């Protein structure tokens, strides 16, 4: 009987620690501008003018290290502002992480669906990065033997995506792993088909997914570029299938077809690592992930009119987040799992490290159940 898997993770507190957001006043912003006008103008989607006045009167704003409570305080060029957002309850999120592999340079975690990797949007504390800080940063023996106080993720998985997440424990490991990921993307851009299909590259990534509809071909190669469009609720823009986008390469293998439920269980190997690549590529070929709240056939978002995008609808950068009316990339509901990763041992590149994350039942074939 094999021992139970090692896990890390501490329960989330009811409230997070709040956040501090810093601004520096330029000469153009300082001309007859009050502190309330500055925040309302720059962060309109965070709160109306009255809301900013209340925050100022509540003592949540500092100018050059001093708390100000007068909303009509004039700003000067060069002033340093700090807005302290009060602690709040973040949405419910899993916290336990299974350790799949660990050596002196690398730790591979099995990320559960629903847990965000890095802070952003509604999730500022409830992230994988926070758990790494808590679980390793407080370990005196770890701190004493490492260049970094805790491991750091070297790539991202979507919040709704589960499976293997690689985290570097040293600066050298972070550099090497980042180079492996970058190499895969550069090979796609070079048009080298042999290497795109798996020959000669250092990092291999295989996913398991449940696609809507029946994929009739046993193997499908997708080379649809992925670009960015403006989209409400996504400050940096939304990734979609776009002829003007950057090269992306995915290879899809059908494992099982369920004609009764009208879905296909597929294995997907990706060479590049564009954000949401598998979701976009499967949707582009007419088979979006089952339960995907965002992407539909064609690799585009549901019910989206780019002419109606309003900048004020984006998440506020200061933390006063509003839930958008339309689906955003972090929404869950789909079934996508980073199942296998192969890469060279970082100390001995002649050895290959193969990491496998156990499959969720819904992504197992009949023989695997």
UniProtKB/Swiss-Prot annotation:
GO terms for molecular function: pseudouridine synthase activity; RNA binding. Its EC number is 5.4.99.-. One of its GO terms (biological process) is pseudouridine synthesis. It catalyses: a uridine in RNA = a pseudouridine in RNA. InterPro entries: PsdUridine_synth_cat_dom_sf (IPR020103), PsdUridine_synth_RluA-like_CS (IPR006224), PsdUridine_synth_RsuA/RluA (IPR006145), RluA_PseudoU_synthase (IPR050188). Pfam families: PseudoU_synth_2. Residues 47-104 form the S4 RNA-binding domain. Keywords: Isomerase, RNA-binding. It comes from the Eukaryota. Transmembrane segments: none annotated. Belongs to the pseudouridine synthase RluA family. This is RNA pseudouridine synthase 5. The lineage of its organism: Eukaryota, Viridiplantae, Streptophyta, Embryophyta, Tracheophyta.
């Amino acid at each position: 009987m094999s021992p139970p898997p090692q896990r890390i993770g501490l329960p989330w507190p009811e409230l997070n620690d709040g956040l501090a957001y810093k601004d520096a006043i330029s000469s153009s912003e300082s001309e007859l501008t009050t502190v309330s006008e500055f925040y309302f103008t720059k962060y309109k989607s965070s709160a109306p003018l009255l809301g900013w006045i209340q925050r100022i009167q509540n003592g949540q704003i500092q100018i050059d290290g001093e708390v100000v409570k007068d909303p009509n305080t004039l700003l000067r060029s060069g002033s340093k502002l700090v807005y302290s957002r009060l602690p709040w309850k973040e949405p419910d999120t899993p916290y336990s992480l299974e350790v799949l592999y660990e050596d002196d340079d690398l730790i591979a975690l099995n990320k559960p669906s629903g847990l965000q990797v890095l802070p952003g949007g509604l999730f500022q504390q409830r992230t994988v990065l926070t758990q790494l800080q808590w679980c390793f940063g407080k370990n005196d023996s770890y701190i004493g033997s490492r260049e970094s106080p805790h491991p750091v993720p070297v790539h991202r998985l979507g919040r709704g995506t589960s499976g293997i997440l690689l985290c570097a424990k040293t600066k050298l490991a972070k550099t090497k792993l980042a180079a492996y990921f970058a190499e895969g993307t550069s090979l796609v851009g070079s048009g080298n088909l042999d290497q795109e299909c798996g020959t000669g590259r250092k990092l291999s990534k295989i996913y398991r997914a449940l696609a809507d509809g029946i994929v009739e071909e046993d193997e499908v190669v997708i080379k649809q570029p992925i670009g960015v469009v403006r989209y409400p609720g996504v400050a940096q823009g939304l990734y979609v299938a776009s002829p003007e986008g950057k090269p992306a390469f995915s290879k899809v293998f059908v494992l099982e077809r369920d004609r009764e439920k009208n879905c296909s269980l597929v294995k997907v190997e990706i060479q590049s690592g564009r954000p949401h690549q598998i979701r976009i590529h499967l949707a582009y070929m007419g088979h979006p992930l089952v339960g995907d709240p965002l992407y539909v056939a064609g690799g585009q978002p549901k019910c989206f009119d780019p002419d109606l995008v309003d900048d004020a609808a984006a998440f506020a950068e200061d933390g006063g987040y509003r839930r958008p009316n339309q689906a955003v990339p972090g929404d869950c509901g789909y079934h996508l799992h980073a199942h296998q990763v192969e890469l060279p041992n970082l100390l001995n590149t002649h050895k290959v490290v193969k990491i496998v994350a156990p499959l969720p039942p819904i992504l197992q074939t009949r023989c695997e159940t």
